[in-house]
């Protein structure tokens, strides 16, 4: 079981306060709609605080996640949240075939996954040393996890995020081999689906923004208020067995 850290001294906006935030742009005309998902001027809701474990968990429980904002930390709650329901993952025949060439492992190379996601050569990189250290500490406490796609004994791709109850808040993913990040996502979903307690239908993968790439895998947008309303039930779901036992094996 994950270890609950010291509570944060910081107070974030409540879920009710966040749900009441207006969308600042005209959804039909002015909201950016590109390969990176739709971004609204109201997505950034706070700046400051710290990245202590208790602060991070308080943020996720209120529907927020951190990204660097200059030298400070920004706290984000997208007006249009990208989410993946476990029964809505789109798996093409080619991806299913490709998955046979990979082995899925959980939490065997967390730091390496984060480092690969933070590679400064990647476009639009945002993971700095502060973020890497903070999530490493969350991992050691049992809250942050990696799902890894291995091939021929080498890490080929993966993803990492934070698991609280029925919520998996995905932070980033990478691949060194074609389709490896998609296979890791498939491994995540299949691992959560295999829950022996029957809670799979009450779990959700949060991907922050619905990029064009992720929409092709079944991700869709929901309004901020809808996401925040779902959080209360999600947080009450038991921890997935996937994070307790790991899930080595083949995806697909």
Where in this protein do the model-derived segments appear?
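N-acyltransferase acceptor-side catalytic subdomain
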Residues: 1-252
């Amino acid at each position: 079981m994950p270890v609950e850290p010291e509570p944060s001294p910081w107070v974030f906006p409540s879920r009710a306060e966040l749900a009441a935030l207006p969308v600042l742009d005209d959804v039909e005309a002015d909201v950016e709609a590109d390969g990176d998902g739709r971004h609204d001027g109201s997505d950034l809701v706070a700046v400051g605080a710290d990245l202590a474990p208790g602060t991070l968990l308080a943020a996720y429980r209120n529907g927020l996640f951190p990204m660097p904002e200059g030298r400070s930390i920004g706290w984000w709650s997208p007006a249009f949240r990208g989410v993946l329901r476990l029964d809505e993952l789109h798996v093409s025949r080619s991806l299913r075939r490709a998955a046979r060439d990979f082995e899925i492992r959980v939490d065997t190379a967390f730091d390496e996954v984060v480092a690969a996601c933070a590679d400064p050569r990647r476009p639009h990189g945002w993971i700095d040393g502060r973020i890497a250290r903070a999530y490493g500490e969350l991992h050691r406490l049992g809250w942050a996890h990696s799902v890894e796609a291995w091939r021929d004994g080498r890490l080929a791709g993966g993803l990492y995020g934070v698991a609280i109850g029925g919520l998996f808040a995905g932070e980033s993913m990478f691949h060194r081999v074609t389709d490896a990040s998609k296979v890791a996502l498939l491994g995540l979903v299949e691992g959560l689906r295999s829950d022996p307690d029957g809670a799979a239908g009450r779990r959700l993968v949060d991907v922050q923004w619905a990029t064009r790439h992720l929409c092709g895998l079944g991700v869709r947008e929901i309004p901020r208020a809808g996401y925040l309303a779902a959080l209360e039930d999600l947080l009450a779901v038991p921890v997935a067995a996937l994070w307790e036992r790991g899930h080595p094996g083949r995806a697909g």
